[in-house]
């Protein structure tokens, strides 16, 4: 062997595998974003999309949540065809709206409203979806929620809103911000007439939604670990120049500081809502004599 042979690269032969490569079907498994546990999607669905290892609550679409909450998953939908236009002719907005509708064929906007029952109790519901434009509140979202509030007022039914949002929709500017006042004013009239409003925060509920109707419930509930706040953590830390607690703006942190009434696991949500509705329902034949 010559010295130069010591520094020469060895040549390796590639032996083809006798076993064919098996492709794993897309969507067969999910990896938990919190603990990293890999689970079969079917098992995750059976567990209401809650991680069996750490309890992390995955985000749900509006229709998934409706299916888990309402009796038989049935909803008489309000304003199903209402959709956003481009009132301010914001550059690129129309195209983005169309992209969102193609990505979410079962949604026309970031909220679904309607009427159903929970444990036999009729209720008006509004369920937001983070999948559509990050759940941002524009004119149509505000209008649909306002109409749902007015329907509950007119029919004397309890109102239930599941919120999830990144905040106001910037492409609609002041028209978007106006929805904060509009929804809050409608709630004030509804609650002033004795209407019951149950608000449920889901991950995440931020910005103009958390600062308006979502925080005005007679009962304010949240799912475990839900991010609930107004401005983002980084913005606040840069403003006050202080390090915030690790659990800052979580549902648990908000409940500890009096901003929420109860943090409810997803598997217990329908039962809890049913109990609250029971408490506020006058049964037929109930005597009010004294």
Swiss-Prot record:
Top-level enzyme category: transferase
UniProt cross-references to PROSITE patterns, sorted A to Z: COA_CT_NTER
Subcellular location: Cytoplasm
Catalytic activity: N(6)-carboxybiotinyl-L-lysyl-[protein] + acetyl-CoA = N(6)-biotinyl-L-lysyl-[protein] + malonyl-CoA
GO BP annotation list: fatty acid biosynthetic process; malonyl-CoA biosynthetic process
Sites where the protein binds Zn(2+): 32, 35, 51, 54
Keywords assigned by UniProt, alphabetized: ATP-binding, Cytoplasm, Fatty acid biosynthesis, Fatty acid metabolism, Lipid biosynthesis, Lipid metabolism, Metal-binding, Nucleotide-binding, Transferase, Zinc, Zinc-finger
Pathway linked to the protein: Lipid metabolism; malonyl-CoA biosynthesis; malonyl-CoA from acetyl-CoA: step 1/1
Biological role stated in the UniProt entry: Component of the acetyl coenzyme A carboxylase (ACC) complex. Biotin carboxylase (BC) catalyzes the carboxylation of biotin on its carrier protein (BCCP) and then the CO(2) group is transferred by the transcarboxylase to acetyl-CoA to form malonyl-CoA.
Assembly notes: Acetyl-CoA carboxylase is a heterohexamer composed of biotin carboxyl carrier protein (AccB), biotin carboxylase (AccC) and two subunits each of ACCase subunit alpha (AccA) and ACCase subunit beta (AccD).
NCBIfam families in the record: accD
Entry protein name: Acetyl-coenzyme A carboxylase carboxyl transferase subunit beta
Protein source organism: Paenibacillus sp. (strain JDR-2)
